[in-house]
Amino acid sequence: PTTDFAKEGLFNILRHTIEIEGAAVLDLFCGTGNMTYEFASRGAVSVLSIDRNFNCIRFVRKSAGELKCDIIKPLKFDVFKFLDNCEIKFDIIFADPPYELNEIPHIAKKVMSRNLLSENGLCIVEHSKKTDLSEDVGFQKLKNYGNVNFSFFSE
């Protein structure tokens, strides 16, 4: 999961980069929904949360219901299959895959090749220091917060 230190740093960058209020957000590998709730609380108009773990999706659905937050839409799906079939554009796509996942480099590649970002949209992939995405299409910058790295992509 994204540390509080890294999350604070990320949202500080986003505050100066993209308008979260009114944004359509896709949260990939959402887990318990930490980032989902953060985007929702900052004014996103919709947050689609994807994870293949049923318990995570059930938790996000239950929490969103308790918070009476109907902009959060949790969906149990394999992230890569979802990206292969998605035809919706998003203003912000955030991915927090397991650091040991070998397919991390494929996330931004699929987002960019499938043209899933809206105009001026932003894709952020969280990863460890061992993963280098700087040669990928659309790469803009890398930000490091301790052991957490964020790679930013746009059209």
Annotated model-derived regions:
Residues 1-155:
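Class I S-adenosyl-L-methionine-dependent methyltransferase catalytic core
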